[in-house]
């Protein structure tokens, strides 16, 4: 079964420590910040209040993990899993960044350090989706994706959301009607001081849709319904199809 969970792992300069998938499941809905680390959630709440009282807003990040995705979904080029996933995540309003696996840290790794070693699965890792004897990575620095294709290991990454732009704090801008510079422009009304807590279910939904797309593309769900259809949904054609493994 595919299981997906996300949580807020950073608000401004307050960042949660690394937590397990189980901790995300257990704690992320216990607080209004939707952070899976209760102690950090309290600090985030205090920091959000500070910005709200100042009439300002703050950005943050959402961490996600996907388990149960079978190996072999995706393709090396136009149907690369991470490309479709990136498109889905960048479609979430206010998103300014998306990364998976090592993400930006990969820039500091050598090829030898970053390359995941592979082995033959012995059935001893609960988080792996593979049959005994099938090749799987030993580590998961690639975030469950290599060369556009799922490896059977958990897919994980992070989405960055910018601070809400509508704030009551006075700002300098240009008035199109008067063609004058305004030094005290204000947005009047209700203002969200932060977006990641609202973005968690959106990110989870986009993850589910992306995984479902690839399950359909690869004929992993009801293949008899799409075999006779032309184009990318032809399971004889698509690289994700079990027939092409």
Where are these regions (language model features)?
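Glycine-rich, mobile lid/loop segments that gate access to catalytic sites or pores
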Residues: 1-77
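Generic secondary-structure signature for well-ordered alpha-helical cores
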Residues: 1-2, 49, 53-56, 90, ...
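Beta-strand segments within the central parallel beta-sheet cores of soluble alpha/beta enzyme folds
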Residues: 3-10, 63, 100-103, 173, ...
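Short, charged low-complexity intrinsically disordered segments located at boundaries
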Residues: 19-24, 74-78, 115-122, 237-245
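Glycine-rich and small/hydrophobic secondary-structure elements
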Residues: 27-36, 155, 206, 211
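Predominant activation on well-ordered alpha-helical scaffold segments within soluble catalytic domains
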Residues: 45, 83-90, 156-158, 200-213
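Glycine-rich anion/phosphate-binding loop at the beta-strand->alpha-helix junction
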Residues: 54-182
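Internal helix-turn-beta structural module
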Residues: 164-245
């Amino acid at each position: 079964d595919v299981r997906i969970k996300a949580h807020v792992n950073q608000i401004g300069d307050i960042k949660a420590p690394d937590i397990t998938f189980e901790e995300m499941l257990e704690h992320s809905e216990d607080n209004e910040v939707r952070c899976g680390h209760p102690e950090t959630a309290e600090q985030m709440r205090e920091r959000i209040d500070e910005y709200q009282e100042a009439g300002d807003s703050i950005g943050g990040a959402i961490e996600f993990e996907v388990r149960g995705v079978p190996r072999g979904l995706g393709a090396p080029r136009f149907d690369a899993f991470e490309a479709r996933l990136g498109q889905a995540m960048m479609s979430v309003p206010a998103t300014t960044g998306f990364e998976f696996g090592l993400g930006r840290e990969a820039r500091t790794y050598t090829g030898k350090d970053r390359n995941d070693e592979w082995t033959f699965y012995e059935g001893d890792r609960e988080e792996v989706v593979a049959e005994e004897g099938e090749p799987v990575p030993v580590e998961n620095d690639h975030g469950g994706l290599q060369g556009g294709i799922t490896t059977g290991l958990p897919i994980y990454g992070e989405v960055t959301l910018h601070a809400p732009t509508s704030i009551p704090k006075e700002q300098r801008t240009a008035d199109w009607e008067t063609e004058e510079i305004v030094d005290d422009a204000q947005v009047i009304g209700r203002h969200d001081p932060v977006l990641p807590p609202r973005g968690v279910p959106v990110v989870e939904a986009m993850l589910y849709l992306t995984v479902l797309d690839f399950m359909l593309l690869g004929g992993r769900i009801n293949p008899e319904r799409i075999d006779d259809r032309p184009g990318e949904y032809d399971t004889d054609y698509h690289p994700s199809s079990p027939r092409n493994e």
